[in-house]
């Protein structure tokens, strides 16, 4: 695979921790854990389906036409009525409203990516209790707006 990466191959790759020995060791450890516990992927995807489904349910119950897109454990809440299928439709999101949501969640101890266009990432470390707490904070936000 390394022969495909520049300078030998045609794929350019760069990043903050590229080639960093600590990052490489962490990556190798992670791969070992995943080999030992292949069910983590299935569990994580099920967790994502449930969590993002709950956000969608909360929005629907309150008549909010916003979009919740997700694939497995990755998801994004878009503050737009338009179905989000690509960059153009994502750009219809109300980014100033997202800023209010972000700041509210941050004040509640829920750390999200600071951009409307960055995904939320669930991990095997997220417990049901943590996800429920997040949903409770989202509910509070929806009640306050």
Where are these regions (language model features)?
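Conserved N-terminal phosphate-binding loop of PLP-dependent enzymes in the Aspartate aminotransferase
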Residues: 1-145
């Amino acid at each position: 695979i390394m022969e495909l990466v520049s300078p030998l191959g045609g794929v350019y790759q760069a990043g903050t921790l590229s080639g960093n020995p600590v990052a490489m060791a962490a990556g190798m450890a992670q791969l070992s854990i995943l080999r030992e516990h292949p069910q983590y992927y299935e569990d994580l995807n099920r967790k994502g389906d449930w969590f993002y489904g709950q956000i969608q349910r909360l929005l629907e119950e309150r008549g909010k036409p916003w979009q919740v897109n997700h694939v497995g454990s990755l998801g994004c809440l878009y503050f737009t009525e338009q179905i989000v299928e690509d960059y153009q439709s994502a750009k219809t999101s109300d980014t100033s409203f997202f800023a209010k949501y972000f700041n509210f969640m941050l004040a509640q101890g829920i750390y999200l990516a600071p951009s409307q266009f960055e995904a939320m990432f669930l991990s095997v470390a997220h417990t049901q209790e943590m996800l429920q707490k997040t949903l409770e904070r989202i509910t509070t936000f929806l009640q306050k707006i």
